[in-house]
Amino acid sequence: MQGDGVRELLAAAREMGCDYLENEPMRLHTTFKIGGPARVLLFPETEEQITALVQCARANSVRLLTIGNGSNLLVSDKGIDAAVLVMDKHFSAVTVKGDTIFAQAGASLMKVCRTALEHSLTGLEFAYGIPGSCGGAAFMNAGAYGGEMKDVLVRCTHIDGDGKSGQLADRKSVV
């Protein structure tokens, strides 16, 4: 990874008050407890920080990856030569409006399933027990017992590789 670009990214993170760790062992951030160091782990607290970090990484040719709670993630002992955005507790809100659940990318599927149960909402039964975050589950179309995220996901707000916010509202939006 380009050293000057990483320095620019870290300077931007510092300036906006975004926590980060350099050369952090990924084994501390994966459910399998394996993995060498990531060049930089970034812990944004707001969507604005995510947007700014994505734009800065792109402008400085820094490879950027995104993770949730590190489930279903195998990292080599050699580590990751990239900056890694971590969608953690700062993006774990789950709310209910009517018969719709709104969950941020870092919210665990278990938390979303419990929220559905507490509000007598059905459709997520298949997801109970899947370790992972909502963002990762939506990205990979997680599923079990005949159900998949595509069956229950109505809309997804995302930030693309250019740092622009957008929404996907149906399968045709992805194709």
Indicate where each model-derived feature is located.
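A short, flexible low-complexity segment enriched in Lys/Arg and Gly/Pro that occurs
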Residues: 37-56, 100-121
